[in-house]
Amino acid sequence: VSGVQAGLLHDAFLGYPGDWIPRSRGADDEQLVAAWQQLDARGFVTNGRVNEQGLAFRQMIEDKTNSLCEKAWRHLGEKTTTQYCELVEPFGPIFLARIDATAGENWMPAARDSRRN
């Protein structure tokens, strides 16, 4: 999966408008057309939109990433991990509010909840 394809899949995963993520990272029309064609060839597109198969693939990537990252947290242990989360979690909403005010509500998609219904 190319970076542009990943952006399109993530847009759909989060319920973002069309091609917002890849465009925000500099993708041009030609790159977007190619990425849509490549996703379509994999069976991930129906009527110009990422379909359920594409969303399932994106979820598989999310699950695999979580699995790979889990080792580091297990190494720290439950107590240290909990302490870390308790330390940093209160700043998340403050950080996102600042991003929203300065860059808009789509920036920092990795920190956003899905808007899909």
Q: Would you name each region that the model predicts?
A:
Residues N47-N66:
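Accessory beta->alpha helical hairpin/"wing" motif in late/C-terminal subdomains of nucleic-acid enzymes
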Residues S2-G3, N51, G77:
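Ser/Thr-centered flexible coil motifs
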Residues V1, G7-L9, T82, E86, ...:
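Secretory/endomembrane lumenal or extracellular ectodomains immediately following the signal peptide
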Residues Q31-V45, G54:
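Basic amphipathic alpha-helical segments that dock to polyanions
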Residues K71-D113:
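Terminal interaction helix/tail motif
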Residues G18-R23, G43-T46, L68-L76:
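Inter-helical turn/loop segments and adjacent helix faces that build the functional surface
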Residues V1-A34:
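Short amphipathic alpha-helical interface segments
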